[in-house]
């Protein structure tokens, strides 16, 4: 059983599997995003305090959730790569980073758009906003450090160490509204208490979160396939692929 699972860590085994899964995740992402946006923008009621401006949360909150979740998954693969020295683990971490950076940027950008009518300013050095900005810098730093080192194995290990150290920022982002007095509102969705929003609002937000999750998987699989082809370019199995043969 363990051997059967372990064989999926081989790039030549994972490459075709990822290729088959990408279209499915893209379709799921598109369908869920369409449903989530429809519910969020046309079905969910108007907020009695923020009016229509609050609807940006249907993009902002899922992006913020995914920015943290992707970083934790990236750090997990970095840890697996360092402990087990598996090439695919490092490739997965590298493939996740751009999507994580994109989600973090979207969270910051939509947060600024939301903050302008709510707080009267585009940006404040609030604990949650600042720690989310640090998360973006960590993603950029991970990618930059990896690109700056010519030796791939050394680059993998150095960037992985940075990712593991930066993982401490994720709980800071999540608990910042509890640890400090911040302008940012508390969590609307929690595992320990009932949600403080209408059912249709929650449904739209969860659908958008699942759409972001499915998109992130598809994008990461597309990227890791490119990384595999680049790193395994001298392998016989890559030369035999019809998609990389010269016409």
Predicted regions and their residues:
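Polytopic transmembrane helical bundles with strong interfacial aromatic enrichment
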Residues: 1-247
